């Protein structure tokens, strides 16, 4: 087993949302296992139906030869630390936990946040979720986690359409924020920066009990 090349792929979901958490996931496996998932219909998670994403998420998490990590950064953390800092911290946590399992580390996007100085085997790949199976697998875990969170929050705040828009700034979502104000799960740094709401919190704490 020592000579089998293992790749750690990393991707995120929820980066550009107005509401909910950022999820960053990492998946470690060899090329043979990656091929198994490609045969199951694995591709960039944005091109998969929610049903297929949840199916693949279960297969990834229950496969005996796949290592995985999922890190969540809440809207509150994003407001206090900034999106870039949260993304870096989450990627750093995954790399620190997964680096001993992998020969190569591949991150979707164009920045390694300076971590390649400490981990020279890091490679950044733009649209990596379309070309690297392990990044696509990480993309599935991150997006399924984000979908699940927003479906749960939708049960508390149906007016914002989170079951459909997943927290992104759609016309309906922005109109709901303008009309009703923000919830405790909105990223106030995002919504205020975009000047789409009054700085008032919705009186909804009783719904959280």
From Swiss-Prot:
InterPro entries: RNase_HII (IPR022898), RNase_HII/HIII (IPR001352), RNase_HII/HIII_dom (IPR024567), RNaseH-like_sf (IPR012337), RNaseH_sf (IPR036397). A divalent metal cation binds at residues 11-12, 108. Its cofactor is Mn(2+); Mg(2+). PROSITE patterns: RNASE_H_2. One of its GO terms (molecular function) is RNA binding. It comes from the Bacteria. It is an enzyme of class 3 (hydrolase). It holds the Pfam family RNase_HII. GO terms for cellular component: cytoplasm; ribonuclease H2 complex. Keywords: Cytoplasm, Endonuclease, Hydrolase, Manganese, Metal-binding, Nuclease. PANTHER family: RIBONUCLEASE H2 SUBUNIT A, RIBONUCLEASE HII. HAMAP family: RNase_HII_B. This is Ribonuclease HII. The lineage of its organism: Bacteria, Pseudomonadati, Campylobacterota, Epsilonproteobacteria, Campylobacterales.
């Amino acid at each position: 087993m020592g000579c089998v090349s293992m790749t750690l792929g990393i991707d995120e979901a929820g980066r550009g949302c107005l509401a909910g958490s950022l999820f960053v996931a990492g998946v470690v496996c060899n090329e043979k296992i990656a091929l198994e998932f490609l045969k199951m219909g694995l591709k960039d998670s944005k091109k998969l139906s929610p049903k297929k994403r949840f199916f693949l998420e279960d297969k990834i998490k229950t496969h005996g030869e796949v290592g995985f990590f999922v890190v969540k950064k809440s809207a509150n953390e994003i407001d206090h630390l900034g999106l870039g800092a949260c993304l870096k911290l989450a990627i750093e946590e995954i790399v620190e936990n997964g680096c001993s399992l992998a020969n190569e580390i591949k991150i979707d996007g164009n920045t390694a946040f300076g971590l390649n100085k400490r981990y020279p085997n890091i490679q950044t790949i733009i649209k990596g979720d379309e070309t690297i199976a392990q990044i696509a697998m990480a993309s599935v875990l991150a997006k399924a986690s984000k979908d699940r969170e927003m479906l749960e929050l939708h049960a508390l705040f149906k007016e914002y359409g989170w079951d459909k828009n997943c927290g992104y700034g759609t016309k309906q979502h922005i109109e709901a924020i303008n009309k009703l104000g923000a919830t405790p799960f909105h990223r106030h740094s995002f919504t205020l920066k975009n000047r789409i709401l009054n700085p008032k919190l919705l009186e909804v704490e009783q719904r959280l009990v």
